[in-house]
Regions:
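Symmetry-related core transmembrane helices of the 12-TM Major Facilitator Superfamily/SLC fold
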Residues: 160-177, 371-386
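Juxtamembrane intracellular "pre-TM" segments in multi-pass secondary transporters
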Residues: 1, 180-217, 402-411
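Interfacial helix-cap and linker-helix signal at transmembrane-aqueous boundaries
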Residues: 29-30, 61-63, 150-155, 239-240, ...
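Central cavity-lining transmembrane alpha-helices of secondary-active solute carriers
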Residues: 42-59, 255-267
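Helix-to-loop junctions at the C-terminal end of transmembrane segments
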Residues: 54-67, 264-276, 362
Length: 411
C-alpha cells in the first residue's frame, strides 16, 4: 500500500476524532448527568481556552521529536482515553480533566499529520496533497456523523463513543502501518536530503514567531474566525426565533458545508500551485461577507442553504491554504510546526470570541445587523492579506513567466 494511501486513511479516521465528542458531549452530559446548557457551555469554553494554550507547545513538540507517526498514534490514544473517561465522570472537575486529555491529543494531530505529509511527499507536492488530506478529513467527518445519526435511533447516545473509539483505533493502525522508509525527516523541514552530515541549526522559536508576515497572517485568520466561528450558531438562534425546526436545519447545514468542502479542498490543493496561495486566501476571506449578507436578509431555511454552501467554500480553502502558507514562510527553519501551532492558537482566539461577539451584536443591532457585523472582520482580514503581497510563494505559472522573462535577452 502506498504511503499516500495511508495518509488518506489517517485523515479519514482522524477527521471526526480531532474535536473529541464535539457537540455530542453536551447531549451525553444532559441525558446522563442532567447538566444544564450553561454548565455544558462553561466546561466547553474552559477546555477550548486550554486547547489554545496547548496548540503552540504541541507544534514545538512535533518539531523537537521529529517522529510524527508516534505522535499521531499518541494523540489518538489521548483522544480515546479522554473520551472514555467521560463515561464514569459525573463531577465538573472529572469531566474537565477528561476533556483536557482529549483536547491535548486533538491539538497535536494537525502539526503531526502536517509533518508526516511533508516528510512523505516533500514541499513541492505538499499543496496538492494537503488538498487531498482535507478532502478525506471532511469525508471522515461525514461518515462519523452519518453513523452516529443512524445509530442513535437503535443504540442511544452511547453510539457516539463507539464510533469515535473505532475511528481512533483504525487511525492508530493506519499510522503505525505506514511504511517508515517513506518518511524523511530532513525532507519534512526543508534540509538537504542527500547530505545527512549537513545539520543546520534550527531557528530559534522567537525568531520564527517574530516573523511579521506570519503574525499578520495569524491576525487575519483570527479576524476570519471571529466572523465565521459563531455564524452558524447565530443562524440556528434566528431559526428558533422564527419558529423553524432549528436542530434539523442546523444538522442539514453542517452536512451541506462538509459535502462542499470535499471538492473545494481538492481544487484548492491544485490551484495553490497554479494560481498561488495568496489568491486562495483572498477568495476565502471575500466569501465570508457574502455569506453574512445572505444570512442577514434571507429568512427561508431552504434558501439559507446557499449561505452554508459558501461556508463550505471558505472553510475548505482555509483548511488547505493555511498549512501551505505557514510552510512557505518558515521553510528550512526547522520550526514549521511550531509556527503552525501558534497560528492555530491565534486564530482560535477569534473563533472562541465569535459566539459572544455575534450575540452581543444581535442584542444591539438585531438579526440582520448582527450577521453583517460578523461579516465585517473578514473585510479587515481581506485588507491585511492584500497588503501581504508576498505572503507565500507564487504559483507555478507565475514562476514560469518569471523564469522566461529572466532568460530573455534583447538582441
Amino acid at each position: 500500500m502506498l504511503a499516500t494511501t495511508h495518509l488518506a486513511l489517517i485523515n479519514v479516521f482522524t477527521g471526526d476524532i480531532q474535536g473529541g465528542l464535539g457537540p455530542f458531549l453536551g447531549t451525553w452530559l444532559a441525558q446522563t448527568g442532567g447538566w444544564s446548557p450553561a454548565r455544558v457551555g462553561f466546561v466547553t469554553t474552559l477546555v477550548g481556552v486550554g486547547a489554545l494554550f496547548l496548540s503552540g507547545p504541541a507544534g514545538a513538540l512535533v518539531d523537537r521529536i521529529g517522529r510524527p507517526r508516534l505522535l499521531i498514534a499518541a494523540a489518538c490514544v489521548a483522544i480515546l482515553a479522554g473520551t472514555l473517561l467521560i463515561l464514569p465522570a459525573k463531577s465538573f472537575p472529572a469531566v474537565f480533566a477528561a476533556q483536557m486529555v482529549a483536547a491535548a491529543g486533538g491539538v497535536l494531530l494537525l502539526p503531526a499529520i502536517t509533518e508526516l505529509t511533508l516528510g512523505i511527499v516533500g514541499k513541492d507536492r505538499f499543496p496538492k496533497q494537503q488538498g487531498r488530506n482535507q478532502a478525506y478529513n471532511h469525508l471522515g467527518i461525514l461518515i462519523a456523523a452519518g453513523l452516529i445519526s443512524f445509530g442513535t435511533a437503535y443504540f442511544g447516545a452511547a453510539v457516539a463513543f463507539w464510533v469515535l473509539g473505532a475511528m481512533a483505533v483504525l487511525a492508530i493502525v493506519a499510522t503505525l502501518t505506514t511504511p517508515g522508509h517513506c518518511y524523511n525527516g530532513r525532507r519534512a523541514v526543508g534540509w538537504k536530503e542527500d547530505d545527512p552530515d549537513d545539520k543546520p541549526e534550527r531557528a530559534t522559536t522567537r525568531s520564527v514567531l517574530s516573523n511579521r508576515k506570519l503574525m499578520v497572517l495569524a491576525v487575519a485568520l483570527a479576524l476570519f474566525n471571529l466572523g465565521n466561528g459563531g455564524m452558524l450558531t447565530l443562524l440556528g438562534q434566528k431559526l428558533v426565533a422564527a419558529g423553524s425546526d432549528a436542530t434539523a436545519w442546523t444538522a442539514r447545514y453542517v452536512m451541506v458545508a462538509q459535502l462542499v468542502m470535499i471538492p473545494v479542498a481538492l481544487f484548492a490543493g491544485s490551484l495553490a500551485d497554479k494560481r498561488g496561495r495568496r489568491k486562495l486566501l483572498l477568495v476565502a476571506l471575500a466569501v465570508l461577507p457574502v455569506r453574512a449578507a445572505l444570512s442577514a436578509f434571507i429568512d427561508d431555511p431552504l434558501w439559507l442553504i446557499s449561505a452554508e454552501i459558501l461556508d463550505g467554500v471558505a472553510s475548505g480553502i482555509v483548511g488547505v491554504a493555511v498549512p501551505v502558507v505557514v510552510a512557505d514562510l518558515t521553510w528550512g527553519s526547522g520550526r514549521t510546526q511550531t509556527a503552525l501551532g501558534t497560528v492555530n492558537a491565534v486564530q482560535g482566539i477569534g473563533g472562541a470570541l465569535s459566539a459572544w461577539y455575534g450575540g452581543l451584536a444581535q442584542s444591539v443591532l438585531g438579526w440582520s445587523g448582527s450577521f453583517l457585523a460578523l461579516g465585517a472582520p473578514a473585510l479587515i482580514a481581506l485588507a491585511l492579506v492584500i497588503w501581504l503581497d508576498t505572503t507565500s510563494e507564487p504559483g507555478r505559472r507565475t514562476q514560469r513567466r518569471e523564469r522566461l522573462a529572466a532568460s530573455w535577452k534583447p538582441a
